[in-house]
Amino acid sequence: MYLLVRMLCEGGLMIALALVLGLLKVFELPQGGSISLEMLPLLFFCVRWGMGGGFIACFAFGVLQVFIQGAVSWGWQSILLDYVLAFGVMGIAGLGRGKPHGIFWGSVLGGAARFVVHYISGITIYKILAPTEIFGTVFDNPALYSLIYNGSYVGIDLVLCLVIFGILYAPLKTYMTGACLLYTSPSPRDA
């Protein structure tokens, strides 16, 4: 029971931190997507607590982001894909839980999963926005457009997260891997 309460508290804090970081955008693209550090606390939580808690926290963040930050969308399908599902699948980063350097490869998995959902959204829903002419030549490739457009901001977000995790890895290794949870037990009066 103690660990469940702790996970819920940490999850709420990480979701709130992700929402605040999502408001602090370095750059915002015209059809949605921005460069920010909103993935950082979510990936951190996923790797610390695993896939179960990670999927729930990331899904909750995606839903809250629609209502708090607003959604750039072309209908309910793009809201479902670009917000709820794209962030929800980041919970796969929880596969890195308890593994050596799991924060890094777990983050890459989570970021890649998010990119795949944005990519699918780009080639199915946003293909109408793909340019028809580039450098004076005909361009009719929504798959390439989605790859470049979505890869530009998700890739930069992921690299920023990995750099910060690299800086924090040595001092926070026990916390990042969740090893401190193995040795934490409530005091007798908490039972």
Predicted regions and their residues:
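Interfacial aromatic-anchored transmembrane helix boundaries in multi-pass membrane proteins
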Residues: 21-34, 60-95, 126-130
